[in-house]
UniProtKB/Swiss-Prot annotation:
Gene: tada3
Organism this protein belongs to: Danio rerio
Cellular component aspect of the GO annotation: nucleus; SAGA complex
UniProt keyword annotation of Coiled coil present: yes
Superkingdom of the organism of origin: Eukaryota
Region Disordered: start-end pairs: 86-132, 208-257, 274-308
Protein name: Transcriptional adapter 3
Basic and acidic residues composition-biased segments: 208-221, 230-249
A molecular function GO annotation: transcription coactivator activity
Coiled coil: 41-70, 364-404
GO biological process terms held by the UniProt record: regulation of transcription by RNA polymerase II
General function of this protein: Functions as a component of the PCAF complex. The PCAF complex is capable of efficiently acetylating histones in a nucleosomal context.
Family: Belongs to the NGG1 family.
Length: 429
């Protein structure tokens, strides 16, 4: 009974079993299936988490049982040490016991090789126990290991920057984003319309023919030199003239589409007799019989200031509400330039998107500055909380010593409370 009294107190843990149905529903469902059903790939992650839960529960049980077993082992070793010391203090008792009970001594010596205590064993056991204690303190099971499935850790690590406090560096980045870029005006420029492909091709064809003729007539190069220069000058003059006229339509009418539509609306129908019924007037020609060229005929019908007339008609129609103001027109008053219309459409969308982004950035900057102010107030609240707790500890220490708090301590406590209350009002406001 005395030995049982010396036994250190043991903890009888009440191990609560893991409810597989609630904690591990997927694991329970897989166990209830037949072998033919198998396990799906999408179930592996859930099964891994549930198996890790069961493993951690089993590890906790094993660690608790190992702790209690170690307590019993240490107690048994200490009891053996006490017997050994008692025999050393009473050698006569040890000698008489050896003479009176030789067989039992032999049995004890033989048994000393077993788990029971013996006269020569406790010291080695004590050393082994100390080694075990030392190893138990640095047991690798106690060292936290990274879980195999670190998806939650990676998720919170990715979310943490969005939940952290706003810094001055982030405010500066927002202010930099609000500045207009240097090349913003480049996106709203409309490039000038180049030469029409027919004009460019005609010029290229003429130049190609001239080069081929020059190669074919190397011997007559000196004779044809002045003429070729004159031809080049004529070609350049014709091209410049066509560019100045902005390529009038094939029918030779110098007026724009709006002017033509307006005149067609003002002219009454069926007032002109058919061409086959009207007599053809005689056109006096020159004696040499040379007819006029289409280019010379176009000169007779050329009217100056047609572009300004087209623009003025458009303005009047828009002001009278007969024409939409957002109708796009191309170069020369033509509204059939699809490339220009698409370019202007995309530029308008870009302007709207830029304005929307700028408004959102301004709103975000305003909210960020407001949050910075609140962060400073929260920091002041934490400082005020510490001051209130310090004053509370002083008052409680005075009461424990059965003395009344001094006026200074009370004033400090009231001051800390009022300051904290004022900061909270600012934070709520």
């Amino acid at each position: 009974m005395s030995e049982l009294k010396d036994c250190p107190p043991l903890k009888y843990y009440d191990f609560k079993p893991v409810d597989h149905v609630k904690v591990c529903p997927r694991y329970t469902a897989v166990l209830s299936r037949s072998e033919d059903d198998g396990i799906g790939i999408e179930e592996l992650d859930t099964l891994q988490l549930e198996l890790e839960t069961l493993l951690s529960s089993a590890s906790r049980r094993l660690r608790a049982l190992e702790e209690q077993r170690q307590i019993l082992t240490d107690w048994q070793d200490k009891k053996g040490d006490k017997r050994f010391l008692k025999l050393e203090k009473d050698p006569d008792l040890a000698a008489s016991s050896r003479h009176s009970k030789p067989k039992k001594q032999k049995l004890d010596v033989k048994g000393s090789h077993g788990p029971g205590p013996g006269p020569g064993r406790p010291k080695s056991k004590n050393i082994q126990t100390k080694v075990q204690d030392f190893e138990f303190e640095v047991d690798p099971q106690d060292i936290p290991r990274n879980p195999k499935n670190d998806a939650p850790n990676r998720f919170w690590a990715s979310v943490e920057p969005y939940c952290a406090d706003i810094t001055n560096e982030e405010i500066r980045v927002l202010e930099e984003l609000l500045k207009a870029p240097d090349d913003e005006a480049e996106y709203y420029k409309i490039p000038t319309l180049g030469k029409h492909y027919s004009q460019r091709w005609a010029q290229e064809d003429l130049l190609e023919e001239r080069r081929e003729g020059a190669r074919a007539n190397d011997k007559k190069k000196s004779m044809m030199g002045p003429l070729s220069e004159l031809d080049a000058k004529d070609v350049d003059a014709l091209l410049k003239k066509s560019e100045s006229q902005h390529e009038p339509p094939e029918d030779g009418c110098p007026f724009g589409p709006l002017s033509q539509r307006l005149l067609q609306a003002l002219v009454e129908e069926n007032i002109i007799s058919p061409m086959e019924d009207s007599p053809i007037p005689d056109i006096p020609g020159k004696d040499d019989g040379a007819g006029t060229s289409p280019r010379s005929q176009g000169k007779a019908f050329s009217v100056p200031h047609t572009r300004s007339l087209e623009a003025r008609i458009r303005e009047e129609l828009v002001s009278q509400g007969l024409l939409d103001s957002d109708e796009r027109q191309g170069v020369g008053g033509e509204s059939e330039d699809e490339v220009l219309a698409e370019l202007q459409k995309r530029q308008a969308e870009l302007k709207a998107l830029t304005a929307h982004n700028r408004s959102r950035k301004l709103e975000l900057l305003k909210l960020a500055r407001e949050e910075m102010r609140k962060q400073e107030l929260r920091q002041r609240v934490r400082v005020a909380d510490n001051e209130v707790m310090e004053a509370f500890r002083r008052i409680m220490a005075a009461r424990q010593k059965k003395r009344t708090p001094t006026k200074k301590e009370k004033d400090q406590a009231w001051k800390a409370l009022k300051e904290r209350e004022s900061i909270l009002k600012l934070l709520d406001g």
